[in-house]
């Protein structure tokens, strides 16, 4: 079983090559599709040079709209969603994120990056993570609703759908992977405005009570995951138990008369 990779990118020519390098030749990757969301910095050309298929959008419509266009073009059974600006991504990170889903231990997986906000790292989950493995069928089912979402409402909308379906989710640590802050990419004030717009979109998409419920649900998923790991470690196979061969009786000697 292999993955289709979907990446929405807007003006990521500087960082996209590192992401594509981690995917090149990966045995679990069947196809890489980059949706160029109206970039003006040569992102599409960089994607082609990195071996990806490219779907070019003439106007920047935001991440949700770009992903909706990409989902319509995919055909595989499972999809790996990746942000275009990741740094430090390695092939083994891709393998570890895919493993719980491909082994059918979970219905979906999401990453916890090394530079995720401190609160998310303390909780052990980033509910806004853009790096996920999940069934294409779920994304296709949700696709008709995506055009009505805010530009940055995709992740929390997806969380709600997975929670409603009772999906089991695995959280995979990516300590060496980072996603730069918007202020680092766009400058301080533009970055702060972009962060504020993202928060506004998230709250427009899902109310605060639902967001808290999503975090609690994912925390419960982590507890289930940890319990399963502990139970697995506690099982000792009969083939690995130490030998318990009984000690033969020692001969006795009669005392001399």
Language model region names:
Residues 2-4, 157:
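Cell-envelope/extracellular polymer assembly enzymes that use nucleotide-activated donors
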Residues 11-25:
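Short, well-formed alpha-helical segments that are part of the catalytic scaffolds
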Residues 36-44:
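A conserved acidic beta->alpha catalytic loop
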Residues 44-73, 112:
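Conserved donor nucleotide-binding strand/loop of the catalytic core
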Residues 79:
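Short aromatic/hydrophobic "clamp" motif used to bind/position activated sugar donors
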Residues 91-112:
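Conserved donor-nucleotide/metal-binding helix-loop-beta segment in metal-dependent transferases, i.e.
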Residues 109-122:
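Short beta-strand-to-loop element that shapes/binds the nucleotide-sugar donor at the catalytic cleft/hinge
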Residues 149, 161-257:
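Hydrophobic helical membrane-anchoring modules
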């Amino acid at each position: 079983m292999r993955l289709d990779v979907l990446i929405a990118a807007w003006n990521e020519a500087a960082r996209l090559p590192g992401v594509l390098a981690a995917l090149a030749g990966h045995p679990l990757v069947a196809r890489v599709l980059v949706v160029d969301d109206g970039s003006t910095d040569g992102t599409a050309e960089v994607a082609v040079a990195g071996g990806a298929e490219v779907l070019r959008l003439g106007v920047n419509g935001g991440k949700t709209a770009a992903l909706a266009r990409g989902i319509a073009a995919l055909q595989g059974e499972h999809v790996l969603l990746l942000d275009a600006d990741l740094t430090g991504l390695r092939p083994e990170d891709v393998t570890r994120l895919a493993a719980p889903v491909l082994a059918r231990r979970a219905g979906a997986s999401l990453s916890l990056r090394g530079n995720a906000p401190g609160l998310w790292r303390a909780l052990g989950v980033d509910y806004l993570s853009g790096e996920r493995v999940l069934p294409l069928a779920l994304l296709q089912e949700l696709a008709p609703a995506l055009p009505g979402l805010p530009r940055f409402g995709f992740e929390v909308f997806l969380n709600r759908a997975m929670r409603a379906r009772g999906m089991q989710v695995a959280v995979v640590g990516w300590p060496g992977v980072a996603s730069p802050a918007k202020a680092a990419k766009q400058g301080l004030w533009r970055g702060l405005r972009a962060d504020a717009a993202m928060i506004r979109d998230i709250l427009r998409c899902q109310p605060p009570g639902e967001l808290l419920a999503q975090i609690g649900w994912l925390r419960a998923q982590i507890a289930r995951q940890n319990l399963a790991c502990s139970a697995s470690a506690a099982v000792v196979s009969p083939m690995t138990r130490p030998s318990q061969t009984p000690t033969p009786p020692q001969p006795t000697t009669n005392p001399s008369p």
